[in-house]
């Protein structure tokens, strides 16, 4: 899928931002906008790639399905890397701020659980499966993309791959695979990692 299909205006805008990025290196406002704008282009590329995955599945083209779904998953990891270069787009910052509200270890754990639930299942199984609240917050954040969304998409693609092969896999219980993340206590750093300008250049190469 070429850059032209992602949207000419979006590509021109993002290419211009990246082309002058080195001149504004260290400018906090520019670098924030750069990451946010390039993130949008990457998300749009992912949306189009998802359409390619769907088309391949409906056509029963196993090879094309594997190729398209693999590229889609790679885009998730690339976006996770991009967003990790800014603290504002890290799930670690969200969790850190939530835990800071607690005075005792028990309160900190409770606030972290609430923070994790709010951006994923929004509550228990009833809320997620029957209340229409799963992904209500819809956050594109470093850490969340790699450890939550990537896992879920890969499981779904594996399910569809088996269907293409003529197998009858069990239906996916998404809540059962999502809930463990909401109850986990694995640490996420709130500190930015990597050079946002260099990663933005990588993203534009992937989009174009």
Predicted regions and their residues:
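Single conserved hydrophobic/aromatic residue that forms the stacking wall/gate
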Residues: 1-7, 11
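Conserved, mostly hydrophobic/aromatic
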Residues: 17, 53
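Repeat-mediated protein-protein interaction surfaces in helical alpha-solenoids
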Residues: 26-36
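C-terminal amphipathic alpha-helical interaction region
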Residues: 35, 49, 62-208
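Short amphipathic alpha-helical heptad-repeat segments
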Residues: 38-49
């Amino acid at each position: 899928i070429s850059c032209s299909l992602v949207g000419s205006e979006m590509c021109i805008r993002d290419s211009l931002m990246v082309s002058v990025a080195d001149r504004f290196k260290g400018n906090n406002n520019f670098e924030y906008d750069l990451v946010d704008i390039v993130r949008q282009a990457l998300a749009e590329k992912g949306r189009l790639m998802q359409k390619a995955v769907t088309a391949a599945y409906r056509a029963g083209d196993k090879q094309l399905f594997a190729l398209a779904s693999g590229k889609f998953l790679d885009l998730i990891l690339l976006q996770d890397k991009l967003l990790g270069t800014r603290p504002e787009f890290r799930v670690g910052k969200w969790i850190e701020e939530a835990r800071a509200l607690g005075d005792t270890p028990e309160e900190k754990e409770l606030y972290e659980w609430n923070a994790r639930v709010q951006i994923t299942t929004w509550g228990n199984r009833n809320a997620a499966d029957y209340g229409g609240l799963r992904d209500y917050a819809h956050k594109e954040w470093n850490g969340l993309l790699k450890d939550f969304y990537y896992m879920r998409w890969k499981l779904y693609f594996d399910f569809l791959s088996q269907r293409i092969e003529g197998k009858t896999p069990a239906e996916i219980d998404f809540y059962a695979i999502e809930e463990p993340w909401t109850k986990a206590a694995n640490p996420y750093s709130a500190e930015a990692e990597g050079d946002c300008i260099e990663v933005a250049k990588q993203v534009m190469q992937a989009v174009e």
